[in-house]
Structures are given as C-alpha cells and as structure tokens.
Amino acid sequence: NKQPATLRAALPNRPLPPPAPSGQRSPWQRRGLGMRLLWPLSQLYRALQAWHARRQRPIHAGVPVIVVGNVIAGGAGKTPVTQAVVTYLQQHGWQPGIVSRGYGRRTTDCRQALPDSPAHEVGDEPALLARTTGAPVFVARQRIEAVQALRAHYPATNIIVSDDGLQHLALARDIELCVFNEDGVGNGWLLPAGPLREPWPRPVTATLYAGQPPQPMGSAPAFALQRRLAPTAYNGLGEHIDLLTLAQQPVEAVAAIARPGAFFAMLQAQGIPLAATQSLPDHADFAHFSRQCGHDTPLLCTEKDARKLWCQHPQAWAVPLQLQLPADFWDLLARELAKLQPTNSPPEHVNATTIGPF
C-alpha cells in the first residue's frame, strides 16, 4: 500500500520551521502557580468526564467509522488529516462520507455542507472539506444525526469519517486517530489547569504529531506528519499566483485559526516578507476586519478563512495547506481497514437520552 498522491505539490526544500512567536507562551505549557490553583477544578472535570463516559451507550452507524480528533483544547491540525484520510479512502475503492459538529456556525439544525455553503451556516471546516474532497459532508450537534442524514441522502456511502469527535462517545467507532500539534500535551493536566480534554495516554489506533512526539507517548503507533504550503495561492476572482512571486514583495497576512503564528511562520519559511500580520479569534467572521496596509500590498489568508474574507476582500490570496504522512501510517490504516467489511445496515435509532453534550 502506497501513500496517496499528495493533495497539492509542495515547494521543494522548504521544511516547516518551529512556529513563529504568536504572543505570550501558553500558560498551559508549564505548571505555574496559576495553573496549580486551578488544579482542583481539573480533578472535578476529570470526575464529571468519567461519569459522562460511564453513562454512554455508543450508537452504531451501520457502516465503519473513523474518528479523527485530539485530546487537547484548540486546534491540532485535525481537518487536514481528515482530508488526507478521505482522499486515501476514495483512491482505494471506498465511498466515504464526512460528519462534523460544525464549530463556529450560527445554525443548530442538521444540514449538509456544500462546497459553496456559507461558514456561518455549516462551519469553516465542513465547507472546506466539501470543497477539497468532493465527499458528502453533514453537520449536526449529535454526530449520529449527521450520519443518519448523510446515509439517507447518499445510501452508497460505506464508511464515515468524523472530523473531530474523539470525546463524542455516543458515536461508536472502529478506528481512532489522535492528532497533536507542536505543543504536545502541554503541562499534562486536564482543563482548566491544562490543555487536555481527557486523560492522556488513552487507547487509540494511531497517534499523529507535528514536531516532537507527545510525552507520554502511550502504546499506540505514532507517526510524524509534515505540513507545507502549496506552491500556488488563489483568490476570490478565480486567479492563481505562485508563492515565489509573492515572495518578491512584502505582504499582509491574516488568520482566524487556533494557531495563527504557525501560518505566519510557514509563509516566512517560503521567503515571503510579512509587512503586517493580524491574528483573529478562531472561526472569526471577518465582519469587522480592516487592513493594516494599503491595497497595493497583497493580502494572504488561510484556505479555511478565504470564503469569509472574500466577502469584503475578493482579491485576498488563499494559501492551501498540504499534509504529508509517512508510508508506514498508510500501511497501518490499510491493515485496519482490511479488518472491516463494508456494510450497509441501517444506523441505530437515536435515543436522545443516550447522547451526551460533547
């Protein structure tokens, strides 16, 4: 089993550097006095989570389920992994569908995310996944509801990939992939004294990490992932430009993601001089965004933010992210998939009393 073709070719010989400073170091990276004072609340959080886990009865989707998630608060790079896994499945004869909660949307119902769906209706990541994979994507607070709707509209779907949802225990799963960014597990404490959503290590099928392996590692196989920027960017006017061309002049960059400093560092790694940067809250809608530079300075953003930014600045250049995973990971995934027989049984009926708040 070979690694699937990369989603977009990377610029040569441009490895990702350590993330650029994006403000003060997170207090979750050390066990300082403030975090120690919050530690008792972490123990309460642990007890409540354990109680929640005990009362769950996982509901089966009727087809195999892969969950791509993390155990830390904030972004860890789950969505690019989801995109890569879905592409792999499509290339190997599966017909995958994607479900997500749709973080950042203003709606609360279960609905399909289409390539042109506004982010405020379906969330940033689901719309991006619909555009980049072509797979059907449904969002719902309870992911089993999204599974039911997806399979009703696309009955040929024979495997589900959940973008996030490692803690959504109401949905039974066959494969779990846990993703870490460069911060690893931080100070190793649970919320609010640390970044962990649940105790780590925990059983998963595989761990994927950027930077150094998270410590402690756990018993699951671990694989390093590499992220690079695609060699070309595109704007809302349908135009494309080579990143090497953008490197010939200072640019303005904006990002409304969990770790904007990482995006800015990747631009700098390509030799692109940054005249100004703006870090907005994750999932920000750009309604009040104003430029710091003149309109003759190119404006760059992430692919996730592009559709929202284009409403006011269609000339902004969206820079796609490319993810590469080692061949050993794809071999492991192939072995795990070989254990699963594509089925087409109806999903279990949703009982609202069995579904938790995650």
What are these regions (language model features)?
Residues 1-23, 91-92, 166-358:
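ATP-dependent carboxylate-amine ligase
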Residues 15-64, 356:
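A transmembrane-helix-recognition feature enriched in membrane-embedded lipid enzymes
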Residues 44, 79, 129, 163, ...:
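Residue-level signal for inorganic ion chemistry
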Residues 50-115, 355-356:
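Walker A (P-loop) phosphate-binding motif
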Residues 75, 146-149, 262-263, 308-309:
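Phosphate- and divalent-cation-binding pockets in alpha/beta enzyme and binding domains
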Residues 84, 88, 163, 266:
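Rossmann-fold NAD(P)-dependent oxidoreductase module
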Residues 102-218:
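Phosphate/Mg2+-binding loops and adjacent switch elements
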